[in-house]
Design a protein with these regions (language model features):
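Subset-of-secretome marker
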Residues: 1-241
Length: 241
């Protein structure tokens, strides 16, 4: 299946998870996500929104998920972050080199760079949900939309809950309007998505461009450089105000 959604991510408490902090840094706690689903696998592309609420043409990152691992396109995310920083401070291009490492990092590598436990960045539980009505429980969530029929999947091992709302007007169409309510306790977030799912035979494979473990120290240094330049920009903005 393929899909396109508008999404909104909200923390369930004041303690924001690491991945949400990164999304907020690129103004992407709400945006658009498109992707493909095959049994046990997900490929996602995340897009920021323009000021007029239209979707940007290029994704700010991509994520590949299967039962074994979660892979993040850190190369694309860095490129977007670097552009945002250099737009505000052109001299930052000297401190922040263009990306030259492998594009994707694993959840283990991401956790090492962020200094958090692996379960704070992995998303493998999402690959275990099957797009089938078998075994689903009909529910009536408080955020239900008129004209939608809602079903809840059995909770995942980590407590992740997924509720799908199908438009009753197009329940058996090839392209179906969907309303998704997703709660991930490990990441302390609630995610709401609205869009469409199109049935299609999909074959997904892990991305080929991977970062080696030897380059993680370099990535950690790059992250520190980004943080330092960002703080410099924020300090300058506060002084100006």
């Amino acid at each position: 299946a393929s899909f396109t959604f508008r999404y909104e991510i909200a923390p369930n408490s004041p303690d924001k998870p690491p991945l949400l902090n990164i999304l907020e840094r690129v103004n992407a706690s709400s945006g658009s996500v498109s992707g493909q689903y095959a049994p046990g696998k997900l490929q996602l592309s995340f897009y920021q929104l323009n000021e007029d609420d239209s979707v940007k043409t290029s994704p700010f990152t991509r994520v590949y998920i299967d039962s074994e691992e979660t892979l993040f396109d850190i190369g694309q995310l860095y490129t977007v972050l670097r552009q945002a920083v250099t737009d505000k401070l052109s001299l930052a291009s000297v401190l922040l080199p263009e990306w030259s490492l492998g594009d994707y990092i694993s959840q283990t590598q991401a956790a090492a760079v962020l200094g958090v436990e692996t379960n704070k960045v992995e998303l493998q539980e999402l690959s275990g949900f099957t797009l089938s009505l078998k075994g689903l429980k009909k529910v009536s969530p408080s955020a239900a939309r008129d004209g939608y029929r809602y079903y809840q999947f059995p909770a995942a091992a980590d407590g992740t809950t997924l509720v799908l709302g199908f438009s009753t007007d197009a329940l058996f169409s090839k392209t179906t309007p969907i309303h998704v309510l997703l709660t991930i306790p490990e990441h302390n977030v609630h995610i709401q998505l609205t869009g469409t799912v199109t049935s299609a035979k999909t074959v997904l494979s892990p991305p080929a461009s991977r970062m080696s473990d030897e380059d993680i120290a370099t990535l950690a240094q790059i992250r520190q450089s980004v943080e330092s330049v960002w703080k410099m920009i924020q300090s300058a903005a506060q002084t100006t105000n």
